[in-house]
Amino acid sequence: MVKFQIKKGDKVQVIAGDDKGKVAEVIKVMPKSSQVIVAGCKVAKKSVKPSEQNPKGGFVNKEMPIHISNVKKVEA
């Protein structure tokens, strides 16, 4: 497992992919898979089964992981 310079709550800029150039905050860091989840970037529509929190089910917009090499830390 590698130690990363990017932590939860850091401001990062996406440097590759559809959201290239966006600056946003890191929601979650996943060191085992070398990925991060960035707020508002790589949003996908996921289907959700009915549950107590969402009785009807349906579709939810959810941020998907981005490889850590595709983001760079930005000084706030």
Swiss-Prot record:
SUPFAM superfamilies: Translation proteins SH3-like domain (SSF50104). The keyword Iron does not apply. Keywords: Ribonucleoprotein, Ribosomal protein, RNA-binding, rRNA-binding. GO terms for molecular function: rRNA binding; structural constituent of ribosome. Pfam families: KOW (PF00467), ribosomal_L24 (PF17136). One of its GO terms (biological process) is translation. CDD domains: KOW_RPL26. The keyword Chaperone does not apply. GO terms for cellular component: ribonucleoprotein complex; ribosome. Coiled coil: none annotated. InterPro entries: KOW (IPR005824), Rib_uL2_dom2 (IPR014722), Ribosomal_uL24 (IPR003256), Ribosomal_uL24_CS (IPR005825), Ribosomal_uL24_KOW (IPR041988), Translation_prot_SH3-like_sf (IPR008991). One of two assembly initiator proteins, it binds directly to the 5'-end of the 23S rRNA, where it nucleates assembly of the 50S subunit. One of the proteins that surrounds the polypeptide exit tunnel on the outside of the subunit. Belongs to the universal ribosomal protein uL24 family. Part of the 50S ribosomal subunit. This is Large ribosomal subunit protein uL24. The gene is rplX.
